[in-house]
């Protein structure tokens, strides 16, 4: 249980550094781009995966 507490402490420290450091705007832009890329990859794999099972 102590390992989980240490893990969440490290995650909270990293989030605080990124949030208070001014990187939040850049990270938001990168996250939007990655979301669109992975959404397109998911849709493509869904359609191409269905064709192979028929």
Swiss-Prot record:
Entry's localization field: Cell membrane
Keyword Membrane: yes
Top-rank lineage group of the source organism: Bacteria
UniProt keyword annotations, A-Z: Cell membrane, Membrane, Transmembrane, Transmembrane helix
GO cellular component terms given for this protein: plasma membrane
UniProt membrane topology term: Multi-pass membrane protein
Residue stretches spanning the membrane: 4-24, 29-49
Pfam family, any one: DUF1328
Similarity-based family: Belongs to the UPF0391 family.
Name of the protein: UPF0391 membrane protein Pfl01_0044
Organism for this UniProt entry: Pseudomonas fluorescens (strain Pf0-1)
Lineage of origin: Bacteria, Pseudomonadati, Pseudomonadota, Gammaproteobacteria, Pseudomonadales
């Amino acid at each position: 249980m102590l390992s989980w507490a240490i893990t969440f402490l490290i995650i909270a420290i990293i989030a605080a550094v990124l949030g208070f450091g001014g990187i939040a705007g850049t990270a938001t832009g990168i996250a939007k781009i990655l979301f669109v890329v992975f959404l397109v990859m998911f849709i493509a794999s869904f359609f191409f995966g269905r064709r192979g099972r028929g």
